[in-house]
Amino acid sequence: PLAELLDEMAIARRVAAEPVAPPEPVAITSITLASTADPTGLAAVQRHFADRVLANALPPEIPEDLITGRLPIYHHAYRARLAEVLADTYGKTCLYMGSDTFDAHARAYAVDQPPHTRSLNRYGEGLVDALRQQYPDNPELHELAQLDWDLRTRFDGADVPVLDLDSAQASGDWTTRTDMLHPSALLRTVTTNVVSLWNAIHTDDEVPEAVLLPAPAALLVWRKGFQPHFRTLDATEAALVRHLHIGLSVHDACTALLEQGLWAGDAAALSQWLAQLLGEGLVRAKHPPAATA
């Protein structure tokens, strides 16, 4: 936000304006290297600095102390930058909660859950559970956050060639292949009208009231090329996709559905499901033969 940026710039200007006495020249006649270095020295300094940055209250400022004199910059920037990362990952959730409310939760999360890797690619996974604990009576909120997270992380799935409808019709064995579902495919169970909420926020329409569904529904999330997608499935199609998701072939999945009494053998319905999976880029092409020495 502009106000925070102006505050941060003001702190930086104040620090830059502080007079710094030039160092007195020192004549170096010899250097003696210690035989052993303190292995905990750097780690202790880093831990001490991190504790101050993560503390809710800043320590008293000592003008001649270079660390405490500049600590407000890091104390503010740490929370602000990670809150921006979370607001980007959970874009629809941020808009649903309101930017100020979300920012407060994001800053608290940044203190409770500091990053442990150099990349922030998957930072914030635990925010879904944090919102679930803080808002137990708002299941649509955590389901919306979960959908935001799932859509963003579909890009972590491997890039594999996909089978289109024309190629499938020319192939005689694709329905008997195992592990044929695209690796980015993910199935979730939702209990609210989270799909309507997400779509309304995305198109900037009036957001409907959050309601519970008559029965839990299956939500399929995947990536087609460079675009993440999601859609709900009816009960039978969801059962089919679950079998495919664990590695069964289409043939074996259909056999399992028949044995479980979940499908009556309707060929027209099966053809429609498979055509949709092919059209949505959810069927991976045949694995290339392994290279031989």
Feature map (PLM): residue ranges:
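Long, charge-rich, low-complexity alpha-helical segments
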Residues: 1-171, 226, 231-293
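Short secondary-structure capping micro-motifs at structural edges
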Residues: 171-175, 206-209
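Acyltransferase donor/substrate-recognition loop-hinge adjacent to the catalytic core
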Residues: 175-181
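Low-complexity, glycine/alanine/valine/leucine- and proline-rich hydrophobic stretches
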Residues: 183-246
